[in-house]
């Protein structure tokens, strides 16, 4: 009997001996027959875009970035284009910070928050268009680092111009040192802990840190790691800028930047498997494969 509807086809396929059917989990597919089914499928995709490692501020950003991404996928826009555009918004934010003054700093903080929201759109567009790639992940990382460098330089210049004292230039040097050291340490950590899956670094790090609750260094890092996330930082800057407390935010940034890289270096050495163990594992795998031949 010839199937005339999708429902009949779905029912008759398992009865055909020439076709193998596999059960697919409900959350991985959606049959769309009506406009209501389409809305249900879109909501399922929205939930799929939320990462397990997303914190409160990241989920708040998703409420804005996901609708934006849904509009972007209607056009020939690639995830890498979104990453570069987001960096441009970040550079504009840094320029307003560098100009100094209350309103300019407040506008810079607002643009910083906009860049943070758009920072989620490149990954969302990549997933919705099935265009995820290692290059895209690394480009996003480079754009994130460049954004931070521009932002920190802008904050340093702005505080120096506003205060008229060279002390902030010294603080700015310490801030840039901490930021660069943190970028290098995190890059090394990403290579050691998440080689081949760089987007999983945070999840891997959290899993390792939570498995050692008695380690005070890791406990401290795990409880405060949300502070250095890009999603939290812009909200904090906006609050400090709103109350004209950017000098406090600047000093806290100097301290935070010089706490990240020691924790990253320590955890990358503590969590990474010894090289000798990797060699032994590869040798055992070769011996096992040779025994099968």
Briefly describe each language-model feature range.
Residues 4-5, 9-13, 17-66, 142-293:
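A feature for the membrane-embedded catalytic helix bundles of lipid/isoprenoid biosynthetic enzymes
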Residues 48-88, 103:
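Glycine-rich adenosyl-nucleotide cofactor-binding module
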Residues 66-74, 123, 127, 137, ...:
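Short amphipathic alpha-helical coupling elements at transmembrane boundaries
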Residues 71, 91-95, 235-239:
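Alpha-helical transmembrane segments of multipass membrane proteins
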Residues 78, 82, 103-104, 136, ...:
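Membrane-interface starts of transmembrane alpha-helices
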Residues 79-135:
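Membrane-embedded alpha-helical segments that form the functional core of polytopic membrane enzymes
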Residues 85, 107, 111, 139, ...:
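Hydrophobic core positions of alpha-helical segments in small-molecule transporters
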């Amino acid at each position: 009997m010839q199937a005339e509807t999708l429902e009949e086809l779905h029912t008759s396929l398992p009865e055909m001996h020439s076709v193998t059917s596999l059960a697919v989990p409900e959350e991985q597919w959606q049959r769309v027959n009506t406009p209501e089914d389409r809305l249900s499928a879109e909501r399922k995709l929205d939930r799929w875009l939320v990462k397990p490692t997303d914190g409160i501020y990241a989920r708040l950003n998703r409420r804005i970035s996901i609708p934006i991404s849904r509009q972007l996928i209607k056009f020939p826009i690639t995830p890498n284009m979104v990453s570069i555009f987001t960096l441009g918004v970040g550079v504009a934010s840094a320029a307003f910070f560098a100009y100094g003054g209350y309103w300019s700093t407040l506008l810079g903080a607002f643009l910083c928050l906009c860049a943070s929201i758009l920072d989620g759109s490149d990954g969302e567009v990549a997933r919705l268009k099935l265009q995820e790639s290692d290059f895209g992940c690394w480009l996003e990382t480079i754009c994130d680092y460049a954004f931070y460098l521009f932002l920190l330089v802008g904050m340093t210049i702005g505080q120096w111009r506003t205060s008229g004292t060279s002390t902030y230039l010294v603080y700015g040097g310490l801030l840039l040192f901490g930021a660069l050291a943190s970028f290098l340490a995190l890059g090394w950590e990403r290579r050691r802990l998440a080689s081949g899956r760089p987007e999983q670094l945070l999840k891997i790090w959290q899993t390792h840190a939570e498995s050692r609750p008695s380690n005070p260094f890791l406990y401290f890092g795990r409880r405060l790691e949300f502070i250095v996330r890009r999603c939290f930082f812009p909200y904090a800057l906006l609050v400090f800028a709103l109350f004209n407390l950017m000098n406090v935010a600047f000093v806290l940034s100097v301290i935070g930047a010089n706490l990240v890289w020691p924790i990253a270096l320590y955890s990358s050495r503590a969590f990474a498997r010894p090289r000798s163990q990797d060699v032994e594992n590869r040798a055992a795998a070769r011996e096992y494969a040779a025994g099968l031949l």
